[in-house]
């Protein structure tokens, strides 16, 4: 992990596809996609139910920042998913602000527009398939506490992409991200907090790496398997995390203490750009405790660990649109192996002796 005094200015987006285990049959959300111009997409969402819904926008296609709003596949007999090149988040599960929500009244329809070429390399051109599926977390109308989740699945859209135009969109965003200004953002109390979190992260990861091969009950609780291949895979991830968190002068990632890519709204604690190995701690991060002994709590150390799993050099995990212990338990074993909060909560549970 390297600290950086250089800042960038805006890049790409995060992913939030959800667990297949979620039941989508009775959802009141009707979501449809439409391509309006080359790689520009309009998403329409209608509340077909009889009750108003207070939807949590962060990390969804209603988010103003660049997050993974659709899944993109190269068309063919065996569709190949196009790698997502945007931001991955860790979101607070408490003390959320009203601005993070959108009330969708019964019978109401709203739209969101975005360009998929910002965070997907579509420069080869040709036919691509698009769809979005997942779940919106929601709160009761008089609250900002998450009360549950509403699943959704959109239609599939096939579109012909002009590769030259799509490539220019992507290059323009990359060029913007490379425009740097000098700033000493990881200094003072923020620098101290970040260095402490990295040290605690390394300690948590080392303990978790050992438990992966020596604590089958805990491994089964979080990863739903005790096979030697699962244990070895999980141990490898934690060993990589321990290496990344173990140094502030070397490693594959760069740590920032200010919102260099403008994605710290809506309850975001921290975010990562896996394609550039940039990690950002948001203002909310510095309001967390350094390391909590409460079961499944969020703190600075586990937020760092969560974001580390998103790095391609570590695992390249997804969030599947969900956070917390209950969501971890709802996933399949295969999904747990690629889910950031599963690794986070396994390590935290060992420390908190859950």
Curated annotation (Swiss-Prot):
Signal peptide: 1-19
Gene Ontology MF terms: metal ion binding; metalloendopeptidase activity
Glycosylation sites: 214
Disulfide bonds: 186-257, 264-282
CDD domains to which the protein is assigned, alphabetical: M35_deuterolysin_like
Gene3D superfamilies in UniProt: 2.60.40.2970, Collagenase (Catalytic Domain)
Chemical reaction(s) catalysed: Preferential cleavage of bonds with hydrophobic residues in P1'. Also 3-Asn-|-Gln-4 and 8-Gly-|-Ser-9 bonds in insulin B chain
EC nos: 3.4.24.39
The record's free-text note on cofactor binding: Binds 1 zinc ion per subunit.
Main location: secreted
Biological role: Secreted metalloproteinase that allows assimilation of proteinaceous substrates. Shows high activities on basic nuclear substrates such as histone and protamine.
Protein's UniProt name: Neutral protease 2 homolog SNOG_02177
Organism: Phaeosphaeria nodorum (strain SN15 / ATCC MYA-4574 / FGSC 10173)
């Amino acid at each position: 992990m390297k600290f950086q005094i250089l800042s960038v200015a805006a890049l790409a987006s995060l992913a939030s596809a959800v667990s297949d285990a979620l039941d989508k049959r009775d959802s009141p959300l009707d979501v449809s996609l439409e391509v309006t111009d080359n790689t520009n997409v309009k998403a329409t969402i209608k509340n077909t139910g009889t009750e108003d819904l207070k939807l949590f926008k962060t990390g969804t296609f209603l988010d103003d920042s660049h997050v993974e709003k659709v899944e993109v596949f190269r068309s063919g007999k065996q569709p190949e998913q196009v790698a997502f090149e945007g931001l991955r988040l860790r979101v607070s599960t408490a003390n959320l602000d009203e601005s993070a929500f959108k009330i969708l009244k019964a019978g109401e329809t709203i739209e969101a527009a975005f360009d998929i070429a910002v965070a997907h390399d579509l420069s080869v051109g040709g036919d691509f398939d698009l769809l979005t599926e997942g779940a919106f977390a929601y709160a009761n109308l008089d609250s900002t506490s998450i009360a549950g989740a509403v699943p959704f699945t959109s239609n599939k859209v096939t579109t012909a992409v002009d590769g030259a135009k799509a490539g220019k969109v992507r290059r323009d965003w990359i060029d913007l991200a490379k425009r740097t200004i000098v700033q000493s953002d990881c200094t003072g109390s923020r620098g101290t907090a970040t260095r402490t979190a990295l040290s605690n992260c390394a300690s948590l990861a080392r303990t978790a790496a050992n438990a992966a091969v020596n604590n089958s009950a805990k491994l089964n609780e979080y990863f739903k398997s005790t096979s030697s291949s699962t244990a070895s895979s999980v141990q490898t991830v934690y060993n990589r995390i321990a290496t990344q968190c173990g140094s502030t002068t070397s490693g594959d990632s760069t740590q920032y203490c200010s919102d260099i890519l403008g994605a710290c709204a809506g309850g975001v604690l921290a975010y990562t750009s896996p394609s550039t190995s940039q990690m950002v701690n948001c203002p909310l991060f510095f309001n967390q405790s350094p390391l909590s002994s409460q079961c499944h709590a969020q703190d600075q150390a586990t937020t760092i660990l969560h974001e580390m799993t998103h790095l391609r050099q570590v695992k390249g995990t997804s969030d599947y649109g969900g956070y917390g212990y209950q969501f971890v338990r709802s996933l399949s074993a295969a999904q747990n192996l690629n889910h950031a909060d599963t690794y986070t909560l396994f390590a935290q549970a060992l420390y908190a002796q859950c």
